[in-house]
Amino acid sequence: MSDTLETAVHDDATTTPSTRREADEPDRNRRLLLFASTYGTLVFLGALMALFTVLSEIILGDQRFLTGANLSLVLRQSAVLAILAGGLTVVLLLGEFDLSIAASMTLGGAMFAQFAQGSYVFTWPSIPFTDIGGGAILGTSWQANAMFALFAALLFGLIVGLLNGLIVAQFGVTAFIATLGMAGIIDGYLVKLTDGRSVPLPAGVTDAAQGTVLGWKAPASWNWIVEPFGKTFEFNLVGLSIPSIALAAAAVLFVLWVFLNHTEAGRRMDAVGGNVEASRLAGINVRRYRMAAFVICAVVAALAGIVLAAGRTGSAVTLVGNQSSYLLQAFTACFLGAVSLREGEFHIVGTVIGVALMTVTFSGLIILGVPGYAQTIANGVILIAALTFAGIARRAAAAT
């Protein structure tokens, strides 16, 4: 008994505050590494905004990054990419990918413009060697309505998604081949339809799409001056507005978030992406949900094209190659999002963070006068750096 008591007293005496700190050190390091792997992208986003704010003052002599005009421009520029990447997230969540999203986006914008200006109408099929058929189904003036043009253009996206899903899910063709081939088909169709020329949109459509929410602008009181370390920084947010297309993007992303996180179909898609065989054994129709994912992706991509044409450029680009940069940007945003908040999982909130990171980077580089080729390089560097950092932090946390 006395030996046991003596041992306990000895052990307690040897457990000093310094040894307890040493024992807690691995846990503390592991928590820090887990935080870095989970929230590193958000921290990097905040650091970039601070960096561009400071560099703008130092290099340019005044604040051009954190201003109302520039933040409004960032919101406007990010809207199209956010919608496109949001739709792509659904496909990536299921372990597939879609290389036709830029083509679907181009198709959506082009068909919307064609319908809106009355250049394209749905007609009855004609019977050869007769005068039967060939007339407009709903009347030319009715089909030129902006709302009809919107739904008709989305219908083309729906058809593309159905074809992609059918080829991949039903016929077993790899998504790489199927969607790459579909992009070529869409490109050829648009060249045949428009001769590769841009299609202008009616002024009424562009005026509405390029406006701001309720016409609101930040008042004159939104102008702050801070003086840290004897240096004066002016943050002039006067004139900050919320573009209508930014609100549209937020609405689309919210619907996708609700669908994926709070509906039975969304949870089943998540299950299919996590383990296909287990989902099949659980009675989930894997083919149906894979097809649905491609349909959602293509329809949302077509909507992104409509937003781009109406809310940004005022006309629809009809050559897929002219918008191919959106393909890489959308994938980059999604993969950046996969290392944000949820480890290695594609999700809408993460995609939004990825889009914000990319748009802020491009905006800052443009303001600082960095050449266009360097901006493209930065796109790839950000993706590689973010994924590498997250992987290193994750492995270090597991080894701790």
List the predicted regions and their residue ranges:
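Membrane-interfacial amphipathic/re-entrant helices at transmembrane-helix boundaries
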Residues: 3-85, 120-148
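Structural signal for alpha-helical transmembrane segments and their membrane-water exit/capping regions
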Residues: 44-63, 94, 193-194, 256-264, ...
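Alpha-helical transmembrane segments within multi-pass membrane transporters and channels
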Residues: 122-183, 353
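Transmembrane helix-bundle core of multi-pass membrane transporters
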Residues: 128-141, 147, 179-262, 312-323, ...
